[in-house]
Amino acid sequence: MELTLDEVLYKGVEAHRIGEIEEADRFYTAILQAQPNHPDANHNMGILAVSVGKTQEALPFFKTALLANSSIVQFWLSYIDALIRLGRKADAQAVFDQARGKGVKGKAVDQMEQRLSELAANQQDPPSDQLQPVLNLYTQG
């Protein structure tokens, strides 16, 4: 008996849920071989990649998921989170702004906005009164 894509996706999600990463990867890969732009399989492959420390490799999966279905809030959040993890804060902010422009909203989106604001605040240069003593020490050798 051949499984439908939804059944294979369910099996992948279940394998992922119980920590069988290789099995989940196998199911998601099977879906993507049949339907390369499948939004859920792409998103879940991105989540798998992040979970094993391959965040850079997750980006194309998240982007494909978004292109296939930009109405799913979690797709946006996962993509933005991956960009933040990679230190690409400006890209994360740009994607967030794009999401807002498409009408994406909700509590999790508001929380992401707060997170991005905090990251931006932490990037600012320190006040000159804090910098001057360090500069003085540096110039003194």
Regions found by a protein language model. Give the residues of each.
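Register position in tetratricopeptide repeats
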Residues: 17-18, 51-52, 85, 118-119, ...
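Structural marker of alpha-solenoid helical repeat scaffolds
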Residues: 34, 68, 85, 101-102
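Canonical tetratricopeptide repeat
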Residues: 44, 78, 112-115
